[in-house]
Amino acid sequence: LTIAKEKKIKYFYQLTLPLEKRRLMLGKMCYLILTLFGANVVLSVGATLGGSVLTTSVPVSGAFPAVVVLTITYLWEIPFFLFLSIRFGMFVTVLTGVLLAVLGTGMASSGNWWMFAPAIPIRVVCPLLHVLPNGLRAGDALLDAGVLLPGIILSLFWFFVATVLFLKWFERKEVR
């Protein structure tokens, strides 16, 4: 939403500040990382409390590790969606997010989950929370904790690549 406001004034205040464009966007990305972490904490607390009332519950022992892992594995989305928001607007960004979430859920249970960045968070959270997508049975391969480290490394790789590409693109923007 902040991008939408900045876009209306053609990024005038951001691009005219005596700071490097790269540092401005890195600051925005750091803020969004903290916001993502906070949102994951709120969601985790809500799921834990809601689970105590409902029949399905999130194990408390896996809740905090899941928050950290989900935050790390969703980092790649920050520069990606910042780019989409700046370039195409909020509608395309939200539509792309929904499409990637649906495709990621479908790919998470396949053997090629590691090739599709949106499937990684869904896949790596299964062993932590013992929550299985699509009602799969316990003992399923999705509970294999061996995917945690590769998933985190791949997500950090995609975050690095997306950040470098986004920052290079944003540095070329000029005030109009």
PLM feature segments, named:
Residues 1, 27-90, 141, 145-148:
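Secretory targeting signals
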Residues 1-15:
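Transmembrane helix boundary and interhelical loop/hinge segments in multi-pass membrane proteins
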Residues 6-7, 45, 49-57, 87-91, ...:
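Membrane-interface elements of multi-pass transporters and channels
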Residues 15-21:
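Short helix-to-coil transition segments within interhelical loops
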Residues 28-29, 97-98, 155:
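Residue-level recognition of transmembrane alpha-helices
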Residues 90-100:
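Alpha-helical transmembrane segments of multi-pass membrane transporters/permeases
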Residues 100-173:
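Terminal transmembrane helical anchor/hairpin motif
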